[in-house]
């Protein structure tokens, strides 16, 4: 890497790296470093009246106070932080004091990984600490961390820019307290859910991510191409149709937690790559699934937070079962005053116009109803609420309602104004299913790019017979948002999808060389801030000369300085 592309701190750290190696200390050792304790456990288990406990710990050095022959550092391991007391004569018991005077005081930097062996004690200030007897260099940090400081409950030098935090999650996790806890809770959400399903005897399975037909949901898929088979494939938008095939095959209850992909917009609650859980249980219906779902979510909340109440933004949400149940058409009537029962597509289109909604000709009856609910109803349900009995046009994979053939046995759970999960009494009539798929194809011909494609193999599977079944899908990212009180999906994804990182545009060296500039001077000119030839057009030759010659001297590049006249000629040649 060109030295001019580095910051001053990065240059110093790389020099320290080389100096460590010159001393015979490998800054990235290969050998295992054995630890026997974590910071949090050391503090929790410490007793003043016991024999001092010998410990071996490892982590990042996050702060350092040097006071001559004695120093304090703060060591951060995977569970927390602990103070370490280091004295010259304890880590350098012999004549050679280089490990303290040179390595620790001068060549180590904040962010470096080190190992500490020593004993636990309480300082005169009452802080449980480790008295170091041996220090080992484990990994040198050659790029400075943004060290966040905390004092009296106040945060200083915070690393809080959302784009930087999401793009460099590794830094966010290292320096911001509480971020790691979100992802620890996420793991607990998964464990609790699996425990709930497994205790009922349901089996976790895996189904294809690359699919010949993108089915199981109304969404735009990502496409790819299989070179060996020379066929187009889709990244799955849902695992539903494959899981139902397993019910046909004889499994009574199956579930899958996995990635889905939808080629759609990104916002505070949507990421194109997301994690979904889907479960299907034979001989059940959507009424059973509502009770099953509310008990599951109550259990997860208790396991993760120790309570059924969670604060999300300004709202306190209580996940204690049972949850309120409201029909979709009932919700629309309550919030708009319009009863859509029995209305055809044109009548509903007129209602949309009266409500001043933006609609288009590609929207069928189901899509129009969905738009009305989304605009006027969805955001009002803060506490967990089951919205039930969706119109048949909205639910091509759902069984018709036993009491009203215009509706389906479907529910969505709304929490904090957003859909959390979606469930059905699954359609298992193959003739009805084929007709529903054909209706979807008509919507596709009208221009609805989210309409489902006919999956003939799935229909064939149903023809062999599928028992009455209920299925439910839940967005794991949104569930984690609720369980951790987060308002954006990016906060619960380690690495959310980001737009390409902005790069400062730079002209090639050849463009500068056309002005008569020697190639070795191009990085110097760009270091001075003139990344493109056009940036030099209005500059004062004297100032430009001072800038680039100053960089030559500062970085000891030993280049032959141009004259002010040379610089003036370069600038004159710019058209």
Swiss-Prot record:
UniProt-annotated location(s): Cytoplasm
Q: Give the binding site residues for Mg(2+) 2.
A: 419
The organism named in the record is: Bacteroides fragilis (strain ATCC 25285 / DSM 2151 / CCUG 4856 / JCM 11019 / LMG 10263 / NCTC 9343 / Onslow / VPI 2553 / EN-2)
Q: Which residues bind Mg(2+) 1?
A: 412, 419
Q: Which cofactor does it need?
A: Mg(2+)
Q: What is this protein called?
A: Lysine--tRNA ligase
Subunit structure as annotated in this protein's UniProt entry:
Homodimer.
The entry lists its GO molecular-function terms as: ATP binding; lysine-tRNA ligase activity; magnesium ion binding; tRNA binding
- Return any one Pfam family short name: tRNA-synt_2
Q: Which gene encodes it?
A: lysS
Keywords, in A-Z order: Aminoacyl-tRNA synthetase, ATP-binding, Cytoplasm, Ligase, Magnesium, Metal-binding, Nucleotide-binding, Protein biosynthesis
Q: What Gene3D superfamilies does the database record attribute to this sequence?
A: Bira Bifunctional Protein, Domain 2 (3.30.930.10), Nucleic acid-binding proteins (2.40.50.140)
């Amino acid at each position: 890497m060109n030295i001019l592309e580095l910051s001053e701190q990065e240059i110093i750290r790389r020099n320290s790296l080389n100096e460590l190696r010159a001393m015979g200390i490998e800054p990235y050792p290969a050998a295992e470093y054995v630890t026997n304790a974590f910071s949090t456990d050391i503090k929790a288990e410490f007793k003043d009246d016991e024999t001092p406990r010998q410990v071996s710990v490892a982590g990042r050095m996050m702060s350092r106070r040097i006071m001559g022959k004695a120093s304090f550092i703060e060591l951060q391991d995977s569970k927390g932080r602990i103070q370490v007391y280091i004295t010259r004569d304890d880590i350098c018991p012999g004549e050679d004091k280089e490990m303290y005077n040179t390595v620790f005081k001068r060549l180590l930097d904040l962010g470096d990984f080190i190992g500490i062996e020593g004993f636990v004690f309480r300082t005169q200030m009452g802080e449980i600490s480790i008295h170091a007897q041996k220090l080992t260099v484990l990994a040198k940090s050659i790029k400075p961390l943004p060290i966040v400081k905390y004092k009296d409950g106040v945060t200083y030098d915070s690393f809080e820019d959302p784009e930087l935090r999401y793009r460099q999650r590794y830094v966010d996790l290292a320096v911001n307290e509480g971020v790691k806890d979100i992802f620890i809770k996420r793991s607990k959400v998964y464990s609790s859910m699996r425990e709930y399903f497994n205790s009922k005897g349901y089996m976790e399975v895996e189904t294809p991510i690359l699919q010949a037909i993108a089915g199981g949901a109304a969404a735009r898929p990502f496409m790819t191409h299989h070179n060996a088979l020379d066929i187009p494939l889709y990244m799955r938008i849902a695992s539903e149709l494959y899981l139902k095939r397993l019910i046909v095959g004889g499994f009574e209850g199956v579930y899958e937690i996995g990635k889905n992909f939808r080629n759609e917009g990104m916002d505070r609650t949507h990421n194109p790559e997301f994690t979904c859980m889907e479960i299907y249980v034979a001989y059940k219906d959507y009424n059973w699934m509502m009770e099953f779902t509310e008990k599951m979510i109550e259990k997860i909340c208790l396991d993760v937070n120790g309570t059924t109440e969670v604060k999300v933004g300004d709202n306190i949400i209580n996940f204690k079962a049972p949850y309120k149940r409201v029909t979709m058409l009932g919700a629309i009537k309550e919030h708009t005053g319009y009863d859509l029962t029995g209305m055809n597509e044109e009548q509903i289109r007129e209602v949309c116009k009266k409500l001043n909604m933006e609609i288009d000709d590609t929207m069928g009856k189901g899509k129009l109803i969905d738009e009305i609910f989304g605009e006027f109803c969805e955001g009002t349900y803060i506490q967990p609420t089951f919205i039930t009995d969706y119109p048949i046009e909205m639910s091509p994979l759902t069984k018709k309602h036993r009491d009203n053939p215009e509706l389906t046995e479907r529910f969505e759970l709304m929490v904090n104004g957003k859909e959390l999960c979606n469930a059905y009494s699954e359609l298992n009539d193959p003739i009805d299913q084929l007709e529903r798929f054909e209706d979807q194809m008509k919507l596709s011909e009208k221009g609805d790019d989210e309409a489902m494609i006919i999956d003939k193999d799935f229909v064939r599977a149903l023809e062999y017979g599928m028992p009455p079944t209920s299925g439910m899908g839940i967005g794991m990212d949104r569930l984690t948002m609720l369980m951790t009180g987060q308002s954006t999906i990016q906060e619960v994804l380690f690495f959310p999808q980001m737009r390409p990182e902005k790069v400062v545009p730079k002209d090639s060296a050849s463009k500068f060389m056309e002005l008569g500039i020697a190639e070795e001077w191009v990085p110097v000119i760009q270091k001075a801030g003139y990344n493109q030839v056009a940036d030099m057009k209005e500059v004062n030759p004297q100032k430009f000369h001072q800038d680039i010659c100053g960089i030559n001297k500062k970085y000891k590049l030993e280049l032959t300085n141009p004259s002010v006249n040379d610089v003036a000629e370069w600038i004159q040649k710019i058209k």
